[in-house]
Design a protein with these regions (language model features):
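Glycine/serine-rich phosphate-binding loop and adjoining beta1-alpha1 elements at the start
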Residues: 2-10, 82-175
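Short amphipathic alpha-helical segments
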Residues: 49, 85-87, 190-192, 214-215, ...
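An N-terminal-biased, well-structured beta-alpha scaffold segment characteristic
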Residues: 2-112, 116-118
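Glycine-rich phosphate/diphosphate-binding loop of Rossmann-like nucleotide-binding domains
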Residues: 7-44, 160-243
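Rossmann-like NAD(P)-binding element
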Residues: 65-81, 221-259
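Short, acidic/turn-prone active-site loops that include or flank metal/cofactor-
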Residues: 64, 99-102, 125-126, 206-207, ...
Length: 259
């Protein structure tokens, strides 16, 4: 099979889809496949073209060449208007975040891809046997582990925060950090907040998940609570509230001191 790695057209997007980084490309080539990459595809992420060339991948100048030559296209972000102008081929496989199952699909894009006979694989809906999402799980870990650090920054006065430090300071009270949802990202956020020395509470409506979290979060208060109960009982007691994007847990009283 011939694999292709095009550059992403969205601003500030430096990720590469389908795990097609140099070491994985080397594995594909060792198995007899061919891999093309667009010039500069990973330079924004600090990976040079030379690293792809060293493992046997072939460089092309344009995105059009990738689509013309390759059977499998590995992207990361959803298809932009520029992506949709590419020369698709019947039987071609495109793996990227299509977002077609989330109510945001563009009918005109679906029609173009269907008429071209392209097979679309949505990375955001691909799951492991345990139900976790294969491509979003590592991103959830990154987001979860960095969220308390960024949230702690916005607790500072110059960012409109309360002035409470997220790390322990002698003679001062600890920051109280709330995490809405104990999924993978929430668990990672709690581990970071614990490590920083904050007082941490995690809310979830899945008792089995809370029981599991009890085994990995030794200094975190775990609460079985709905969003309405949270809003009434706890929201005003917090310094920092963290929640994954798309969560339905929202309350207007979070204000500038919550992120």
């Amino acid at each position: 099979m011939i694999f292709g790695i095009p550059r992403e057209l969205k601003d500030h997007e430096t990720r590469v889809g389908a795990g097609l980084i140099p070491r994985n490309v080397a594995t594909l080539i060792a198995q007899g496949h061919t891999v093309y990459f667009q010039k500069g595809v990973m330079e924004p992420a600090g990976v040079s073209d030379e690293e792809f060339l060293k493992v046997g991948a072939k460089c092309v100048d344009t995105m059009e060449e990738i689509y013309e030559k390759c059977d499998f296209i590995g992207k990361f972000k959803d298809m932009t208007d520029g992506d949709m102008k590419m020369p698709f081929k019947k039987g071609q496989i495109i793996m990227t975040a299509f977002h077609m199952a989330e109510g945001t699909a563009k009918p005109e894009q679906v029609k173009i891809l269907a008429d071209a006979g392209v097979t679309c694989i949505s990375i955001e809906t691909s799951r492991y046997p345990d139900g976790s999402r294969a491509m979003t799980r590592p991103m959830g870990e990154i987001a979860g582990r960095t969220a308390p650090l960024l949230g702690g920054q916005y607790l500072q006065r110059q960012y409109g925060g309360s002035g409470v430090s997220i790390v322990p300071v002698t003679g001062a009270r600890r920051a109280r950090v709330c995490i809405l949802g104990g999924g993978h990202a929430g668990m990672c956020a709690a581990q970071t907040a614990e490590g920083l020395g904050a007082e941490v509470v995690v809310f979830d409506v899945n008792i089995q998940r809370l029981e599991y979290l009890r085994t990995v979060l030794k200094n975190t208060d775990l609460r079985f609570m709905s969003k309405s109960a949270f809003a009434e009982e706890v929201a005003d007691q917090l310094h920092l509230c963290l929640s994954r994007h798309g969560s339905s847990h929202r309350d207007p009283r979070y204000g500038s001191q919550h992120a």
